[in-house]
Regions:
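Histidine-centered, transition-metal-coordinating active-site segments
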Residues: 1-109, 118-123, 130-132, 151-152, ...
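Conserved N-terminal alpha-helix of the aminotransferase class I/II PLP-enzyme fold
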Residues: 115
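Active-site-proximal cofactor/substrate-binding loop regions of enzyme domains
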Residues: 112, 134-144
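Catalytic glutamate of the conserved HExxH
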Residues: 142, 146, 155, 212
């Protein structure tokens, strides 16, 4: 194949430079421009973003000041750090709803985060919000979750009497703290739950809606696959308003968010989709999350995780922390370290330690049903 014809204004490039290694000999694909600096990209974005969108400037606002990257926007650095972090990778081993499922196609916290990012960036792209900030918040929003589902919050809360354990707050303030993310990213993580104060950015508000849209739709889909529900169980009001298929439902909810932004300039959702989302979520709580079998498993999760926290708090030398050996057993500091360690565990690891350290019989371990 011959080289692509010359592109006007690109004659300064030497496409035969012998000091450059290429993956494919004889490659003809041509970029035709040099990399733009971060400052140039920031200037271009300033004109392209919506008036209320969050502008990436310099290194961003961080707890520990950093020099800016020559090419990457500050929120792109956050996004890269999240993707390369251990807490985010461990989400692959944490359940979304069903603990230790035998079906490999049921969602994990990681696949949920990816789906939230897809929904959120789709909305953000349509209204010219800051995409890397939106995606960083979406991918990181559940990094504070403990093993074995939402029951971990109930398990850990007594050990943190001042604040309790809220996965959103703990994720932003403890789990993700070593990454030194921008304040805007951490704010979106901290406040993505609807019971929290509103996020400070429209990107964070978009993620809050995307999270609810994603989990309401895909948790029902997973419950059908697990045999807990059938497609016919879907409430009629939901079916009428947004359809029966998950793809139709997500599409309808996203269009309703965009319609609300068109009408008001603020992130929200128009009717009848908003009522359908509430009905759908209430149905999921009744028939999936709070059904008797799920509550029985949650009680096992709570006993298991509290047993592990007590075990490590009473023997902090077991903890893989550099300063754990100097901590007084049973102290507040030891308990805080134990909660941080146990909350980061995957389901498989926590269940394994239940057998190894606590003497649980495998048949007594929590299992998703």
């Amino acid at each position: 194949m011959e080289l692509a014809p010359a592109i006007p204004g690109t004659d300064r490039f030497d496409r035969t430079d012998r000091e450059v290694t290429q993956a494919h000999p004889g490659v003809t694909a041509f970029v035709g421009r040099a990399a733009r600096s971060r400052e140039e990209r920031e200037a271009g974005l300033d004109a392209a973003l919506a008036p209320g969108a969050t502008r990436p400037v310099g290194a961003g606002h961080r707890s520990r000041p950093e020099a800016p990257d020559p090419y990457r926007l500050c929120f792109e650095r956050d996004l890269d750090r999240v993707k390369h972090s251990r807490p985010w990778r461990r989400l692959a081993g944490k359940c979304q709803v069903f603990i230790a499922p035998e079906d490999d196609h049921l969602r994990t916290r990681l696949t949920h985060a990816v789906e939230v990012a897809q929904v959120a960036t789709g909305i953000a792209r349509a209204v010219d919000l800051c995409l890397p900030l939106t995606e960083a918040i979406a991918l990181a929003h559940d990094c504070g979750h403990g093993p074995a589902g939402h029951a971990s919050e109930e398990a850990f809360s007594p050990y943190l009497p001042t604040t309790g354990y809220d996965h959103a707050v703990y994720g932003a303030d403890v789990t993700l703290a070593p990454l030194n993310l921008c304040h805007e990213t951490l704010d979106g993580v901290r406040n993505h739950s609807w019971r929290r104060p509103p996020p400070a950015t429209p990107e964070g508000e978009v993620v809050a809606w995307a999270d609810r849209i994603a989990y309401v739709c895909h948790d029902f889909q997973d419950a059908v696959r697990a045999g807990i529900l059938t497609p016919d169980d879907l409430p009629d009001d939901v079916r009428t308003a947004v359809g029966a298929r998950s793809s139709d439902q997500i599409g309808s909810f996203v269009l309703a968010v965009l319609a609300a932004i068109d009408q008001t300039g603020h992130v929200g959702m128009t009717e009848p989709a908003a009522s359908a989302l509430r009905t759908f979520r209430d149905f999921n709580f009744e028939r999936i999350y709070l059904r008797p079998a799920a509550r029985r498993q949650a009680e096992r999760v709570i006993r298991l995780l509290r047993g592990l926290v007590d075990c490590f708090a009473d023997a902090p030398r077991r903890l893989p922390e550099p300063d754990a050996a100097d901590v007084e057993p049973g102290s507040t500091a030891a308990t805080a370290l134990a909660v941080r360690y146990v909350s980061g565990m995957t389901d498989r690891y926590a269940l394994g330690l239940g057998v190894e350290l606590l003497g649980w019989r495998p048949d007594d371990l929590p299992r998703g049903v």
